[in-house]
Amino acid sequence: KRQTKCIMNIIAVVVTYNRMELLKRNIRCLQQNKPISSIVIVNNGSTDGTTEWLAAQEGLTVINQTNVGGAGGFYTGIQYAYQAGADWIWCMDDDVFPRADCLEQLLPYTGKKDIGILAPRRLLEGEIFTHDFQAYNLSNPFVSMYSKKLAGRHITSPTEITGTAFEGPF
């Protein structure tokens, strides 16, 4: 069950647009074994009832704005979390469903001096996500942006990465 006390100020930032059912599942999945200080939902101008549903929810911080895209939503949410004094910010889209122990698995690495971002392993319908790589090279349009594909479903020790998608980085 979810604990009620949080030692670190951990703020989850979720960006959503017109995917209310996915958002509901995402919020349920954020009820982690280790507590999150707060959940910030950046609603990018949803028109499917999400705005009204969010207004009726308790325990969420909701930022309603016009649709400025995913990156714009993350900018808004990360800025809010930073100004709120977050020690760690957990970013994700509304279609990301972290396992109940995901945060618990990430927390032991937060005290290490050489770690600035933690990225959990991404699975799609229980299978390894096909584009999970250790590095993304966006500087040359003539070569693949992917390098060093991660192999194996379970990674038993931390693996250095130089980039990640906005699908669960902490």
Annotated model-derived regions:
Residues D101-F133:
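Conserved donor NDP-sugar-binding/catalytic core segment of glycosyltransferases
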Residues R153-F170:
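A recurrent flexible, glycine/aromatic-enriched loop bordering the glycosyltransferase active site
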Residues C29, N43-E52, V96:
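A conserved acidic beta->alpha catalytic loop
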Residues K1, K5-C29:
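N-proximal low-complexity "stem/linker" segments adjacent to membrane-targeting elements
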Residues L54-G72, T76, Y80:
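Conserved donor nucleotide-binding strand/loop of the catalytic core
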Residues S37-G45, I63-N64:
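Short beta-strand/loop segment that forms part of the nucleotide-sugar
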Residues A86-D95:
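Short beta-strand-to-loop acidic/aromatic patch adjacent to the donor-nucleotide binding site
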Residues R28-S37:
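Short, acidic, metal-binding catalytic loop of nucleotide-sugar glycosyltransferases
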